[in-house]
Structures are given as structure tokens and as C-alpha cells.
């Protein structure tokens, strides 16, 4: 070990003794070699990792966002025994527009209202497509990792070239899986200008610096290679809207108008409030993220905050008083509210004590999914069977989704590009520990059920609910919470595996 470390130091000394240009070229060659190796591993993984099949003889239940399916399941799946009533078709998430928001009232606001997402402007000075977090909200401090996702994009493109097979899976499960909205890389959209900040180029991954050095220097017309966490976050948010408005039993064969209205909000156009352009603009203003730079779970969560969303802070701790101030501010009207838990469940891999609790988050009736992932990529996880988690992979470039003034003008082909029946799965042991977990709370009964469910899990709970936020002076938090925190320095962040 000593000689190896010494050799490493000698190599570094040799590099430092060369001219800056030669040193830079050597570092680039080493990084390029590592990327070629990564691509090779992905190709082999694609060959040896075919579409998953179901063991019919075992007939183990398979879950999709809180619904359980067996081979003889006929229609919508079986939710857990204790569930709340299905929301009415007109139920919506509502947007919060905080005072610090900048911008002018414009088309994105009207598009949001037309889609049934009313905007509360009673205390607002201005409306932004994705406003800055309200004063008093705490910045999330979840370690994030820069991206290297060319290999993931290549692997995913191969996987989705052919239509999915049934693989022995319950047809009702496949119908449910296919009905979830799937946001992917897009190409050919309106250019997102490059940042003029001299630090912007250094913030890009090596892959993106190499890629953009031979391309258009004016900006980005595709998010391939850097936007997968944004797309995973869009998927989570779009499905929260869909379930809130249409109910959990919605399938593609029922009421496509609702889907068109929601898809319109995520078009690859600045006029769409939750477009890639507006995510990037908000990331630059609120999170210090440059165009072309990878977004982590925390930055993505902050960009989603324009809806009525409760965000946890650097601990996986949900405070009831804070939640109620968002969901039921006047004490009389409970609004459907999305809880986003941005957390890290280990250093390089998920600690095994959290495996069962993590899988159970996809079995709760309030489940909206997990945005996060696997080494070298970010996915949107929506299902589970045993120790395997099913996901929608955003690393599949497709033509830009256009903005339609009239959502009814979306074609079947454009809607089809937001869905897939092809299954991909990953063992829980192979998941990256940094993630964003979503839950949709429809009413107070739902809230009470969710609190009980996240507390009584097998293994160690990953979410804790406390009555009061200690920073409000109304309590002292949960005893022992500080002992469970894993302190990580900035240097540790560079070793995390949540690459794009």
C-alpha cells in the first residue's frame, strides 16, 4: 500500500512539473480513458441485462406507486388495506408564489391556471414561472455528485429501441406502469444560452466540456448528458399532478384531455412553467447552477417549490407544524400537498438497514416515487418486487416536446413519447444513496395514515415526523436525531456516485 501511494505521489509530482498545457492534456486523456471504459461496461451490461421477467410460479406481488398486482389482478391493483378515498377528478395541487419571486405575470401563469393548478397571488408582488423559495425556507444540504452520463444515455437508448414484452408480468401492472408520465432527454429545443460567468465552464463535467468544445458555442439545444435529474424531477412532479387531478386509477385509455393539459406544462419551451428552460433559469437564480451543469436532488427539489410543496431540510425530518402551514394555512381547507424528502442513506451505497423502509415508500398509497438513482445516472423509481425496484429512465433522447397554446392539439405520437411499457429494474443494493422521495397527501386522513405508515416499517425508518420545528421555539426535535447524521465534507461530495 505504501509503494502504491508513493507511486501516485510521484505521478502527481511529474504532472505538476510539466507545462500547464501538457498537464491538462494528460488529465484529459486519463478522464477520456475512464469514460471509454465506462461506456464499454454499459454495453456489456446491456447485453447481459435483458428486460426483466416475472416468475409466474412464485407469483410474488409487484407494486406500482402504492398498488399491488398479482397475475390474476384484473384492473387497477390492490392498494394497502388502510387507504383514504380517491380524490375527486377536479382535485389539484396549488401553487405558492412567495414574495421574493421575480418576474412578470405572463403566459406560464395562464397555462398553469388552464391546467387546473390555481395560483395564489394574495401576498405576491410578482409571478415567476418557477419562483424563488419563500423567505424562511431553508436550503437543502444533500451531497450531490457531478455527472458523466453519456454511457447511461447510450445504454438507455439501446434498451428502449424495441417495444417492451409482457415478460410474464400482470397486464394490469403493465397498464399502470405505462400510464405514468415519463420525461426524458430532449433534443432540438430553443437554445438555453451559456453562462458568461468564467466559472461556468469549470462547473461542467469533463464529458460535457469535451462535447461542447466541438459543438455550438452559443448554448444548449439538448439536455443530453446533464439533464437527467431535472427530467426525473419533472416525472415525479407530473405524476403528482396527474394523480391529484385524475385519481390513482387513471389509465391512458381514460380522459386523455387531463394528460394533455399536464404535458403542456412540461413542454420544452420557456412558455411552459415547468420546462427544462425554466428549471435551468431557476437553478441559476436560486441554486447557483449553470446551464449545462448537473442538477442534484436538492436543486431539483427547490425548482419544484412553485407548487404547494413541503420540503424537508438536511435531515429526513418532517415537522407537522411546518407541513400544516403549507397544506392547511387557514385551518379550514386542506390542500393536496406534495412532500419531498431529499436525503442520503449512506456514503457510497445505501446502508442495508434502510433497504426495507426504502422499498416500502413505493408501497404506500401516498407514493409518488423516487428521483435519484444508480451509479452514473438518475432515474425515476415507481415500482418494486422483492428487492428489485422498477424505474423510468430519462436517458433516452427524443425530439423536443413542443408547446401548444391549445393542449388538445397534442398528437398521439407526442403523448406516446411520454410513456413506455418497457420495464427496467435495479436491485436496491445497487442504488445510489442520494435521492428525492415524493409523497402526495390529499387530505388530513391521508396525512394521519402516512405519519403512521412511515413510522411503522421494517428495518430503520428513513423519515421521522415530529410535532414542532425546534427552530420555531416550540420543541426540541426528536431525541437522538443528531446522532444519526452522517457529517460529510465538500471533499466527500466528489466521491458520491450520483452521476448523470
Curated annotation (Swiss-Prot):
Enzyme Commission identifier(s): 3.4.22.-
UniProt key word Transport: yes
Reactions mediated catalytically: [protein]-C-terminal L-amino acid-glycyl-phosphatidylethanolamide + H2O = [protein]-C-terminal L-amino acid-glycine + a 1,2-diacyl-sn-glycero-3-phosphoethanolamine
Keyword Protease set for record: yes
Enzyme class: hydrolase
One GO-annotated biological process of the protein: protein processing
Alphabetically ordered keywords of this record: Autophagy, Cytoplasm, Hydrolase, Nucleus, Protease, Protein transport, Thiol protease, Transport
Entry superkingdom: Eukaryota
Active site, UniProt feature: 228, 393, 395
Compartments, record wording: Cytoplasm; Nucleus; Preautophagosomal structure
UniProt-recorded name of the protein: Probable cysteine protease ATG4
GO cellular component: nucleus; phagophore assembly site
InterPro entries associated with the record: Papain-like_cys_pep_sf, Peptidase_C54, Peptidase_C54_cat
GO MF annotation: an example: protein-phosphatidylethanolamide deconjugating activity
Family: Belongs to the peptidase C54 family.
Function comment: Cysteine protease that plays a key role in cytoplasm to vacuole transport (Cvt) and autophagy by mediating both proteolytic activation and delipidation of ATG8. Required for selective autophagic degradation of the nucleus (nucleophagy) as well as for mitophagy which contributes to regulate mitochondrial quantity and quality by eliminating the mitochondria to a basal level to fulfill cellular energy requirements and preventing excess ROS production. The protease activity is required for proteolytic activation of ATG8: cleaves the C-terminal amino acid of ATG8 to reveal a C-terminal glycine.
